Amino acid sequence: MIINTSTKLITILLSILLVISVVPTIVHSQSNYKPPHDKPGPAIDILRFRAFHVDIAPQEILANQMDMYYFGLKVAAAKDIRDSPGIKVHEAPTSTISLLLNPAPGPEGQLNPFSIKEVRQAVQLIINRDFVVQEIYQGMAVPMLTQVSSYDHDYLTLYDMILESSINYDPDYAKFIINEAMTNAGAELIEGKWNYEGKPIRIDFIIRVEDERRDVGDLIRSEVENLGFIVQPTYQQFGPAIYTVYSSDPNLVGTGGSWHMYTEGWGKGAADRYDSGTLNQMCSPWLGTMPGWQELGFWQYENEELDLLGQRIFSGNFQNEEERNSIYVDASKLCLDESVRIWIANIITNLPADDSIEGISLDIIAGPKSLWTQRDAYIPGKNDLTIGNVWVWTERTTWNPVGGFGDVYGNDIWRNMYDPPITRHPFTGLPIPYRANYDVTTSGPNGNIELPSDSFMWNSETSSWSNVPVGSTATSKVVFDYSKYFASKWHHGEQINMADVIYSIYQTFDLTYNEDKSLMEFAIATVSKPYLDSFKGFRIVDDNTLEVYVDFWHFAPDYIADYASITSITMPWEILYSMDTLVFDQRKAAYSDTAAQRFNVPWISLVMDRDARLVRNVIREHNSANNIPDNVFNVQGLQLVSDSDATSRYDSVLSWFDEYGMLVISNGPFMLYRYEPPAQYAELHAFRDENYPFKPGQFFFGEADLVDILDVDSNIIEIGSDNEITVTLTGFGRASAEVGAVMIVGGNINHFTRVMTTA
């Protein structure tokens, strides 16, 4: 959206944009880390999670009630505690806030102002981002207009577009746009308030209360009221707010218990050099995170062009980096123009920790909340750590690997319990192998690789694996070596093997392509299909190795491997099989929240006693009947699971439940020992299998050796002449910096230099 505001830019502004791609000196960082032992698994034996309200968190960490706090302190509290002895406050741009507008038309006879695009665009102009950043967050934030901020790698990709948008705080111009749009829609302004068909228009505004979003929400409420709307604020915490917004039909807008606006908050998981997920998540309806949520029977926000552009980025449908960036710009520009999700700020989150903790690796986005920290962290002389958070459990916390793990609080615990095949480098944001090694072969973007004749795909019509048609081709092949998984065991003591990989692949495909299953879990199936359509075949090479063939290409080959990694190998096949039986055969539970609501069954969560018992009962039935999904485990004449294998698996799960009362079983450095929702408490114990592949320090990164700008020295810029700008940088290690000098004259943008420097 490009809006010409009443204030014209008439001065010459020189803007230096410095985006730094760091090559960290990992050897130097590792030399500063001394593992407390050389045993397999994490550095400590016990990892606890406790809930502390954000307002009392500073006192509690000073009183040694916790060692690290995972929820960002309020800015004033962070400043007060920063100089306290024994405390180090880690800063990380890990949180973003946005305003979600409901674009549904609403019931007949009512007018939802946000169903009008011009009204949504006008809301951009009443968001005083500078006030939010400087006053509410006291400088500990940066303003945002798009799904990426100045801390993200792709900000450089969008920099010109953001400048061209000319979006600034301009409530007078916003009111002008609103007056015209609302009048054209048939509304009347009566005594300063908008009415439609003789009734005042009321805006239902869900405002979160746990942090500064309450203040941000009140600021926005006041601005919307100044536009002539009656605003009814509802102040809610995480669980009720999420349920109201993301589990309801947007077209109920204007009825009791619905919503027009919501103050969203997001946690960034890791750095990402070339974004595809965030763009699609925040802009493109096909992925199921725009109003309507792709749930059957709900009104859906639709935008075919955004879906097309987003899927091109997601599926690697471009010829080179330049075209990829062009598509990314076009999609982001259209998303900004639609203004369904309005970005406000990227928060510099203040995360306090005991300064004696060793082994903290700081992701440049997630800070200490990354995959790495709790695997290496310890306090000398202690064998445990306590992590505080604002919640351990909420009404929306759901532990199932198919349609759960949607909240940040559950994920803060869960990420310590499983090992992903591939993850992101904490500094560069590029995919790197973690527990699976891989080899990429590609003929992309325009060539093809012919699939071997013994490659196979799941056939939902015959409920079996079928050979791919003769002459089948794919753009890329990725060979995955899972030996680091298969040499070790699941937490319940059973060996991880190819059956776990194959069942997970089957489960994903059958949920999507089996008509009965896809109707039950409609939202999951609809979102999954565009991704799964790009897979052309699989081939088991040997006991440890799987070939995956996909129609996907990327100029950075590691992204091809990341895309082709269809299974995360997070839970054993017998758990997945029993959940499938419970959900699709017995219909006593559901994987997703919307399906659970539609069929009036539990949204399955394996940490909850009721749900875990339901799954336990199914496992008992499978065990007594000696049930095995033979059609799944018979692959090209290879039988992956025997009767004795299945019996051993079932027995181990039942023993696990008897001991722990839960059914969260995974493969990472920690296993779940206790989980107590009423007490807001979770306890993880170290997993010390002798063949677990990692020991403390193997993936210790420390801090990135970032480059800082010390000075920008330039004379008066002469248009049409060669000009020299001297940028003084400082920093350790090796770094590359791309400096773009942009001159803006009367709103026109002209590029002068784009150079590479080192420091």
Where is each model-derived feature located?
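Surface-exposed, Gly/Pro/Thr- and Asp/Glu-enriched linker/hinge segments
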Residues: 29-45, 77, 83, 113, ...
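Extracellular/periplasmic solute-recognition and catalytic clefts
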Residues: 32-36, 48-107, 265-269, 275-281, ...
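Long beta-strand-rich cores associated with HINT superfamily self-processing modules
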Residues: 278, 282-283, 290, 351-396, ...
